[in-house]
Amino acid sequence: MSSARPHWLLPAAYCLILFTAAAAAAVDEPHGYRLDDFRAHTPATLEGATVVTTAEAERLWRAGSAAFVDVLPKPPKPANLPAGTIWRDPERQDIPGSTWLPNTGFGALQPALEAYFQAGLTAVTQGDRNRALLFYCLERCWMSWNAAKRALALGYRRVLWYPEGTDGWARQGLPLERRAPR
């Protein structure tokens, strides 16, 4: 009995793996905001916004032609810390010159957080709804997608979404700097 496999079997298996991976990574835009499982594959598009690559984000950053908005959540202080424990917020490294508006990328915002988001955008755009706003957080993070969608709903007309976020930025050896929330 021959143990030889048909010559087409290995290439066919390889194609099946590639097709399955591509299908798993293809994500449709939801009708509303993403409400859970924020660290997952994101859509390739955001209706009404421009999706930018790292190279495009770098050009915008160097030209100063967009306000960069980081929406990565700020980790809360653990409620069960032993008495006397000193809590230090984890350091956030983001794109130089950015404004960090933490927690504003969740799918549903409480009124106070919604007001904070609106005030933050008004501050970085000086009230100009035509000012380009670039939203980011981490790669495979729905927070920036939600925040960009929310900015569109608020009437901002030049919304950019950078899905690679600080992960893609750092991979290219571009600078990051420590940031505190606005």
Task: Enumerate the language-model features and the residues they cover.
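Bacterial N-terminal signal peptides that target proteins for export
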Residues: 2-12
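Rhodanese-like catalytic fold shared by cysteine-dependent sulfurtransferases
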Residues: 18-55, 60-63, 78-134, 138-182
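Glycine-rich nucleotide phosphate-binding loop and flanking beta-alpha elements
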Residues: 75
